[in-house]
Amino acid sequence: MKLAFLYAGQGSQHAGMGQDLYETFPAFRAAFDEAAAAVDFDLKEVCFTDAAGVLKETQYTQPCMTAFAAGLTAVLREQGIMPDYAAGLSLGEYSALACAGVFDMQTAVALTAFRGKAMAATAAGRTCGMTAVLGLDETSLQACCSAAAEEGVVQICNYNCPGQLVIGGEKAAVDKAADLALAAGARRCLPLNVSGAFHTLLMHPAGDALREKFQSIHFAPMQFPVLFNCLGHEMAQNDTVATLLEKQVQSGVRWEATVRRLTELGVDTAIEIGPGRVLTGFVKKAVGNAISCYPVETAAQLQQLLCTMKGA
């Protein structure tokens, strides 16, 4: 068996996530509490109850998701379950790097909190958006974006799986590209409930802020390979983690390529770490049954996974 950990991104968060894991697994609780200490708000309250309704805001979503990942990773590590490879969708990449020992999970939470604030600040005051495009190939959608460029910035920002791409940019240009995509044969275009054009050139100021932040961070060597969003594969010898993370926030997430690369590397089993099962769905659509993917969000799912892994 070759195992990959896949860390979820923004969009699958919900109030109550991680609460039963926190109450059931001491290792989850300890790692979660340590991670929560890295931010300037009550992270546990936002994750478990979200009374103020802020969990959907990116500056809160990102560190909350990362703390959840820290807890689950700690339980798996305690049980002797560690991956051969790791990858994470968007903000999940920080958790993947922490799992690989590049920095600790508390640093990952602090960095994703900073990243969330930088992305929110970059998006503020701009009329931007993102739209999922279903049932159209990459080449055709790229042509639609090029034709809509007279309305403003628009580009493909997520390459999720076959038949599911996401475009982002200035709203008028995104709307125009979506109309052209429907005319070109797209099955549906679904506007996403997000506050900015993430993973597009419009996030350049956030990339600049991250580059400056990274100057104070020590990046240790990876204990195992991480596949990077902006590449769709492992880093090259002349790449640096800091440069790739800076690039990631302002360029497309190549998730389908990442999943296909995992199969080339011999991965046959994956654990989705995060609320929901979005990545499990993407894996299934990209490579079918070549990778058995186990989503883990609840204590019951984790107990079942531990039994499965011990029997493997």
Model regions: which residues?
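Alpha/beta catalytic cores of group-transfer enzymes, especially the acyltransferase/condensing modules
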Residues: 10-12, 37-39, 100-251
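Short, solvent-exposed amphipathic alpha-helical segments in soluble enzyme
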Residues: 22-23, 147-149, 182-184, 285-288, ...
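NAD(P)-dependent dehydrogenase/reductase Rossmann-like domain
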Residues: 174, 213, 218, 266, ...
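Non-catalytic positions within long, well-ordered alpha-helices that form the structural scaffold/packing
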Residues: 77, 182, 263-266
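A short, acidic, amphipathic alpha-helical segment used as a generic capping/interface helix at domain edges
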Residues: 250-267
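FabD-like malonyl-/acyl-CoA
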Residues: 1-141, 192, 269-287, 291-303
